[in-house]
Amino acid sequence: MSGGTPYIGSKISLISKAEIRYEGILYTIDTENSTVVLAKFALLGTEDRPTDRPIPPRDEVFEYIIFRGSDIKDLTVCEPPKPQCSLPQDPAIVQSSLGSSSTSFQSVSSYGPFSRMPTYSQFNQKSFRSTKFGRGRFRQLNKILRTFETTTSASLSQSSAVGSSFTSDARSLKTQLSQGRSSPHLDTLRKSPTMEQSVQTTPASHLPPPGPVGRRSPPPARPLPSVNQRTIESQEQKRVEAHRLSRPEADQLRNENKDANKRQAAPGAPPARRGRGGHRGGRGRFGIRRDGPMKFEKDFDFESANAQFTKEEIDREFHNKLKLKDDKPEKVEKPVNGEDKGDSGIDTQNSEGNADEEEALASNCYYDKTKSFFDNISCDDNRERRQTWAEERRINAETFGLPLRSNRGRGGYRGRGSGMGFRGARGRGGQRGGFGAPRGFRGGFRGTRGGREFADFEYRKDNKVAA
């Protein structure tokens, strides 16, 4: 076979440096990235070649695979490209698809993912002019692949994105062929190695210039019947009807849920099982305002709003809150033995001096140990502040109040404790059953001995309770 026969579209047997053989159709060769792409390939495994990791063959036929030129060990041309058959120019043909055995690889450079890949004509005129091949070794192509740049590698993300686009295009084309309708995306679907098999005819305004692949277009004088537009309109009408029917069905389900809740709340009905979170309800359209958005008659008057606030009064109130003076009424000195101390100059001088000192202390004192909260936890207190049970019980009662004693089940309240039990009952306070609120160790007893105060029990040295 002469060198003028194109290699693109030939069946290629490729062996990688891992001794794994792949067999598929040569789709294209990228000279910039030094990659080779095989379409419709099969994995034949390592076969009998010596390798550390033998791989068995697989029966699946994959869409495509990209090889780096530096990782290819050997190439063999198994079969030349098969001749292409074209359909007759019949205006009655709306859409057709060829079998999987017939593929076309001549318009390689027009594909989106491989826009930089050269066509066969570049290789045909330069390096393969004097090469003859049959089922023998493809030595010349192997030498060219080894002269490619080995520093660049194909990106895995790009290959995965290309593979997903091929499979999605194939699925969408199959659904369109089964429904018998066309789509404006059919021109883009043709630009993939697996979609080149299908031969479709559309109106002349959507067709690219005719090529040697075998696409035929009907004469422009005879327009095609508008079957596709009718099917699209009917589908849109069905969607609108389904949307209209969905709202009454949702209202009906909502009413049924309300009736079921009423039946459960009836006096003769058995009590419903109590859950943890209660009824969540459906995801209906609740809380929607039906009176429309709020409307205002006029703009907001900032001047009248600011006139209601007096800056001086606000500042005065703020400064009054910052002052921490003692508001005790002044003591009126009573006369002693019928004599008024105010008559003596010494007493008057001493009282004036004491008043000045008190005012100075009152203005500089911001913390009163006799009134402040939690003053007993100060670091200046060197005494041992280990609280007794009675002290902590009193503090809990003053802080949180007394709990209800008729609480049953796993009641009580969480927090610092329920005021019952040793050390404030940190955890699940109260009792876990029984007929009262026993006050025992760490949250109460689990038994049914209720109603007895903790003070009724005797303490022993080993912290055991005597009945």
UniProtKB/Swiss-Prot annotation:
SUPFAM superfamilies: Sm-like ribonucleoproteins (SSF50182). Residues 206-223 have a biased composition (Pro residues). It is found in: Cytoplasm. The keyword Ribonucleoprotein applies. It comes from Pleurodeles waltl. The keyword Ribonucleoprotein applies. Residues 172-182, 194-204 have a biased composition (Polar residues). Does not appear to bind RNA. Residues 172-292, 325-358, 402-451 are annotated as: Disordered. This is Protein LSM14 homolog. Component of a ribonucleoprotein complex. It comes from the Eukaryota. Gene3D superfamilies: 2.30.30.100. Residues 414-448 have a biased composition (Gly residues). Keywords: Cytoplasm, Ribonucleoprotein. GO terms for biological process: P-body assembly; regulation of translation; stress granule assembly. Residues 273-287 have a biased composition (Basic residues). A motif (FFD box) lies at residues 365-381. Residues 233-262, 325-344 have a biased composition (Basic and acidic residues). Pfam families: LSM14. InterPro entries: DFDF, FDF_dom, FFD_box, Lsm14-like_N, LSM_dom_sf, Sm, TFG_box.
